[in-house]
């Protein structure tokens, strides 16, 4: 079949070219956005007197038929159509004959695909915010339930300081809150209509870009027609937003994987979100979080691929731009499914609170609190750090933990350690009331002492939960102010 653009060619394109050149297999998901753009465009052509009433009614009727066919999944796509834009135009001509050929008056596929993508990106950004809000809600609820579920906190994957599960989980709330805010910022920035920019230099027809902008629902438009069709920074930014979400999901997935091992034994995944082994009958594998972790590289890879494609292109439009869609669509699908699965995993997993608390009493995670206390008594913190470091060494040599030390052992240890200190610090350490230090050696009491803003003490955590609720409510209300481009 002849191409709609084939007037200056004497040969049909090679079959391999058709296969290589076509994007219809993946850009067909833009069909309703493309139809919206065409409806707004043809209405503007009529309002500006570029087409007459009869043509306008015929074209609009044809576009409505195609919309219904698409809804019923009856529209057929062929490689020879190249892309969704040509496919729709070809179908319109089949339905309405010669009048269908007037649809593309004063328009290029360059501004056509740009407006399709901007509407698509705006709508998907808000959909993703809603998915993030679902995860934030689950995390917030978990945190509220576990303000006093004590556990070790980690640095370098080594037990570091005591905290609570509520405090630990709430850190993900704030990561996702920033991801959601970033998407809303993106939605505002993408609120630009490129329609009417033509191939890149506008058009000589008396069009009204303001009319199509308002009909479609954009609040702004690209001020430069070349910029409108030659830019893919919005696609790039959107994939960055997706990458950030996946990176945060991956870090959460990594912890769920670790916590579900017998070595940690902090959680158990629900059977509905785990798999077995083909050879080892006892296995319960965390395949879902592992795949979330694994798919993160795929999304970040798409970001790198598009940035690399985009970086060296001259103005204005280049066919290379077609490469933005497959990676973007794949990234979007990956993030949407990962967010849905994560909220389900978090809301169904079993939390082994006793094991978490037990782990607190198997290490020296309260060492910092002891050093802090010594500093409050007048010993310079760096000396206090050294004192507690030597105390840890003493305990390890005698196969003991802090809470197992007696008052007498602590007195003897401090006197031995004091010899390495300056005179003032020696005096303070040897006269120290060791009963108070023994009291600090309880990791749970250490948690309650950490009451600075953002810390895990119950009072501080309750305040943070209140702040989280405010941000959650604000985001929820913001999302309601955005309308989908699709009816």
UniProtKB/Swiss-Prot annotation:
It catalyses: 2-(N(omega)-L-arginino)succinate = fumarate + L-arginine. One of its GO terms (molecular function) is argininosuccinate lyase activity. Signal peptide: none annotated. Pfam families: ASL_C2, Lyase_1. It is an enzyme of class 4 (lyase). It is found in: Cytoplasm. The keyword Ligase does not apply. Its EC number is 4.3.2.1. Belongs to the lyase 1 family. Argininosuccinate lyase subfamily. HAMAP family: Arg_succ_lyase. This is Argininosuccinate lyase. It comes from Natranaerobius thermophilus (strain ATCC BAA-1301 / DSM 18059 / JW/NM-WN-LF).
